[in-house]
From Swiss-Prot:
Domain BTB: from-to ranges: 7-74
Name of the featured protein: BTB/POZ domain-containing protein At5g17580
Family that this chain belongs to: Belongs to the NPH3 family.
Pathway: Protein modification; protein ubiquitination
Residues with Phosphotyrosine modification: Y383
NPH3 domain: residues covered: 180-442
Gene Ontology biological process terms, A to Z: protein ubiquitination
PANTHER family for this protein: OS12G0117600 PROTEIN
Key words of the record: Coiled coil, Phosphoprotein, Ubl conjugation pathway
Length: 548
């Protein structure tokens, strides 16, 4: 080396001074060696200015250069790799150099473990930009994807159905890593690494989509819902990433999380694409929601926020649902029924809230009436909500009570609803009278329908009797004719038998006489038969003439 080398090099790392031997450092680092050859001492002192290096990590590098004992950890390995790569501490400069040793530790001690890999990825976040050329980030991602493909539970535990067993059977492949049951959670890595990792995992198609969704939902809860309000900028970025990563498939995401996400996206003033994305997902499965999910939208923002402050957002969601399912079919009709019942349940839930204003209740009630029109047969749900609202707002005047009750369609109450409303002392007197009148009209209509039905039934029975009697007359006539024919037939048979006996008797006597005379032959026999036949025919004619 040049004689101009100064033995000591003073470097400050975040206020911590380090005294290094230039010759020892130049032996391991090609970059330091090059600067010393050009005698650029000032540049050498600022050699680490472009790196995000902490004193603990640089101390490992210094100990390695001095030949002292050192120890890698998953917390420091990425930063050490970054320094070694930046300073050119490779095998070309010196055998058994720092870059090779750090790479070996990464391969054999970090990558086999899910938790160690997550820890290294999280700790070395700021150093990855300097390692973009070598593709180290992709190596980390592929390692994690392989582990998650083998056992998706590393991303979190799904809520199991009763039919499912507790045993999970991983993919039948050779395992080249260890499974950490108390593992580090993927959602702890920085957002700028989490999003590209999840995109890469989705494209790989090797991890079940349910586990992808589970991880993204956990990320939203940690970095959007549960963080401090002062970090609104970071939360806005996080909610937009969450929206981009979530699928649109119906039923994969819980309604609770979708409602929370929509509310926060509006509060954080996220992009319109983000807000619309959550709205579309909600519309796809609003029929699967609960009344408590709708309450999330109506609740204000902040820790002291009360429920039912934002009724307009609830109305917007319900309206968007019907716009989304504009083309009716057999499947969407069932969705409409469920959403109509959901609106009634939400109205009932809101009615018990003492802080709910009259105007807000009326708006919700009108919305419920609109979505129930032509869908639900009875308005008992709206009546129950009105009853609860009047109970929790006993200070209302008679005119205000009338304002509340104007949405009630008395004609759509069930019989049980009529009975309850007629005895309800909280209702305005005019409403009770209206209920009684409608009830009487319905009873009258019911009785009239019953009478009409009975008359129609009697008429039908009389027509049936007439038809039966006419049929009986026809049957009697037919029976008489058949009886007459049977009598005629019997008489014919009797007469024929008598005539045959007489003829046979005559033929036999005459035949004997002829035989005695010896004049019986075939011709005479034939004649006798013909004569007999003629005689029978004549008698038959006489018989027919007799019946005629």
């Amino acid at each position: 080396m040049s004689a101009s080398y100064v033995s000591d090099l003073h470097i400050n790392v975040k206020g911590v001074p380090f005294h290094l031997c230039k010759e020892m450092l130049a032996k391991r680092s090609s970059k330091v060696s090059s600067l010393l050859e050009r005698n650029e001492i000032d540049e050498l002192r600022l050699i680490l200015r472009d790196l995000e290096v902490d004193p603990e990590t640089f101390e490992l590098v210094a100990r390695f250069c001095n030949g002292s004992e050192f120890k890698f950890t998953s917390d420091t390995i990425v930063s050490v790799l970054c320094i070694a790569y930046y300073l050119g501490m490779n095998e070309e400069q010196s055998s058994n150099n720092l870059l090779g040793k750090a790479s070996e530790f990464l391969e054999h001690r970090v990558f086999p473990s899910w938790s160690e890999t997550i820890n290294a990825l999280r700790s070395g976040d700021k150093s990855f930009d300097k390692l973009a050329d070598v593709g180290l980030v992709d190596v980390f991602f592929d390692s994690l994807i392989e582990k998650a493909s083998y056992d998706p539970r590393l991303l979190g535990e799904l809520i199991k159905n009763r039919a499912e067993t507790d045993d999970y059977r991983p993919n039948p492949r050779r395992r080249l890593f260890v499974i950490d049951w108390k593992s580090e959670d993927l959602i702890t890595i920085p957002l700028r690494l989490y999003e590209p990792f999840m995109i890469r995992a989705i494209k790989s198609r090797s991890i079940p989509v349910e586990y992808i969704v589970l991880s993204v939902c956990k990320y939203a809860k940690k970095w959007v819902f549960d963080t401090e309000e002062s970090l609104s900028g970071q939360k806005r970025e996080a909610i937009e990433v969450v929206e981009r990563l979530l699928p649109y498939q119906r039923g994969l995401i819980s309604c609770e999380l979708l409602f929370e996400s929509l509310k926060h996206s509006i509060w954080l003033e996220a992009s319109s694409e983000c807000q619309n994305g959550f709205m579309i997902r909600i519309c796809k499965q609003l029929d699967m929601a609960k009344s408590t999910d709708l309450k999330i939208l109506s609740r204000g923002y902040g820790e002291k926020a009360e429920g039912f402050e934002n009724i307009e957002l609830v109305k917007t969601v319900v309206k968007s649902f019907y716009t989304y399912y504009a083309n009716e079919d057999s499947e969407t009709v069932s969705h409409f029924v469920k959403v109509a019942k959901l609106s009634e349940e939400f109205l009932f839930l809101a009615a018990s809230e003492a802080s709910l204003k009259l105007e807000a209740f009326v708006e919700l009630a009108e919305m419920t009436v609109a979505v129930s029109q032509g869908i639900l047969s009875y308005s008992d749900g709206i009546y129950r909500a009105i009853d609860v609202f009047l109970e929790s707002h006993r200070y209302l005047t008679e005119s205000e009570k009338m304002e509340v009750c104007k949405v009630l369609e008395c004609g759509k109450l069930s019989q049980e609803g009529f009975e309850r409303a007629a005895k309800n002392q909280k209702l305005p007197l005019r409403i009770v009278v209206n209920v009684l009148c409608v009830s009487q009209l319905q009873i009258r209509d019911t009785v009239a329908k019953e009478i009409k039905g009975m008359e129609e039934k009697v008429d039908e029975e009389e027509e049936e009797e007439i038809e039966v009697s006419s049929d009986e007359d026809e049957m009697e006539k037919m029976s008489n004719k058949l009886l007459g024919l049977e009598i005629e037939n019997d008489e014919c048979v009797v007469h024929r038998r008598k005539n045959m006996k007489k003829k046979k008797k005559k033929i036999s006597v005459w035949g004997q006489v002829k035989r005695k005379f010896g004049c019986l032959n075939s011709s005479s026999s034939s004649y006798s038969v013909d004569a007999c036949t003629c005689d029978v025919k004549k008698k038959k004619k006489k018989i027919h003439h007799h019946y005629e």
